[in-house]
């Protein structure tokens, strides 16, 4: 009899615990994201989804950083080196091939039966079609807000779906310290944000992939003085005469040719084109202050908004700027 009572008490305790857990674990959570009309605001999404479909590299970056990669059941083709474990072609069938970040394979998305689908701006037109399959989380970088703040907001939106907000706060506390170290090097300096592509140089607006240099680090982007930018992310063609006249203290060059693979198809390297006889007459060249983002070009071009991408970008800036600053200080002494 005592054994029966003990067993009944144990079962009751278990049921009470399960009930309490159910009461404290919500079925849905409200996050800040974009809706089908591209309006940023509150969106209700599933809490703790188990099956995740990802059609955006920045979102995949964040999901991986939060240790949630084992829940990814489908992904767009991956071109970012540190995310290749999620490449459908290399996953031995564990991850469905959902197409690309620009074009989703709707049939495959439906087949993998996701609880939630993450997309970026390139797939905004497919929001309604994807939403018919599963709830959609549409996140994008707001460059006017600043890439760091925007990345934090997006990472926190994803983290709050899984109860991992503290992980995001820890990451960004470390990022803030690194930015504080970099900021005095270029703050108030006249810089030129630019993009190299297929043997030509374009000027980049501040609200572009390179915005961290102007917005968060306080540099003055001379490119903004040249004209209006209809498509900031694509830049505007420039002439060497314009660059000579602007005479920047620093040049930052995002290498799109390398990011897209064109550099492997006979296109000249960025340095070969940019470091011509005219540019070599400028102090920015003589002082070694032309900074090329080549090694992680695809991160700068396609993954802005990911926390690991931000770590990579800060690493590139540290590697380029801190040695230059140390050299300049030594020369001044």
Residue spans for each PLM region:
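Bacterial Sec-exported substrate-binding components of ABC uptake systems
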Residues: 19-64, 166-194, 255, 261-267, ...
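Structured C-terminal subdomain patch of bacterial secreted/periplasmic proteins
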Residues: 31, 149, 160, 186, ...
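Short, solvent-exposed loop/turn elements at domain surfaces
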Residues: 39-43, 60-65, 80-85, 199-205, ...
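A short, structured surface patch at a secondary-structure boundary
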Residues: 51-108
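Extracytoplasmic/secreted envelope proteins and their assembly/folding machinery
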Residues: 46-49, 56-63, 106, 124-127, ...
């Amino acid at each position: 009899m005592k054994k029966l009572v003990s067993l009944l008490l144990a079962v009751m305790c278990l049921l009470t615990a399960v009930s309490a857990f159910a009461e404290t674990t919500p079925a849905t959570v409200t996050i800040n994201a974009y809706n089908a009309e591209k309006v940023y605001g509150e969106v209700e999404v599933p809490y703790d989804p188990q099956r995740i479909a990802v059609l955006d590299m920045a979102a995949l970056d964040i999901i991986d950083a939060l240790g949630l990669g084992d829940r990814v059941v489908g992904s767009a083709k991956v071109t970012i080196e540190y995310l290749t474990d999620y490449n459908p072609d290399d996953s031995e069938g564990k991850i469905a091939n959902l197409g690309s970040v620009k074009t989703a394979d709707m049939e495959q998305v439906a087949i993998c039966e996701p609880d939630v689908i993450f997309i970026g701006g390139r797939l905004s037109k497919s929001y309604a079609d994807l939403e018919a399959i599963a709830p959609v989380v549409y996140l994008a970088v707001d460059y006017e807000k600043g890439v760091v703040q925007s990345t934090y907001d997006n990472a926190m939106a994803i983290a709050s779906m899984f109860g991992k907000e503290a992980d995001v706060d820890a990451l960004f506390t470390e990022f803030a310290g690194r930015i504080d170290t970099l900021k005095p090097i270029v703050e108030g300096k006249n810089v030129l944000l630019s993009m190299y592509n297929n043997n030509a140089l374009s000027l980049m607006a501040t609200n572009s992939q390179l915005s961290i240099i102007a917005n968060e680090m306080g540099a003055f982007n001379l490119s903004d003085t040249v004209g209006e930018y209809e498509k900031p992310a694509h830049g505007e063609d420039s002439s060497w005469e314009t660059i000579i006249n602007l005479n920047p203290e620093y040049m930052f060059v995002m290498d799109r040719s390398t990011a897209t693979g064109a550099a492997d198809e006979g296109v000249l390297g960025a340095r070969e084109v940019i470091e011509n006889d005219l540019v070599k007459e400028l102090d920015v060249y003589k002082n070694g202050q032309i900074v090329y983002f080549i090694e992680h070009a695809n991160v700068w071009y396609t993954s802005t908004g990911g926390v690991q991408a931000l770590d990579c970008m800060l690493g590139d800036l540290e590697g380029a700027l801190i040695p230059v600053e140390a050299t300049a200080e030594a020369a001044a002494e």
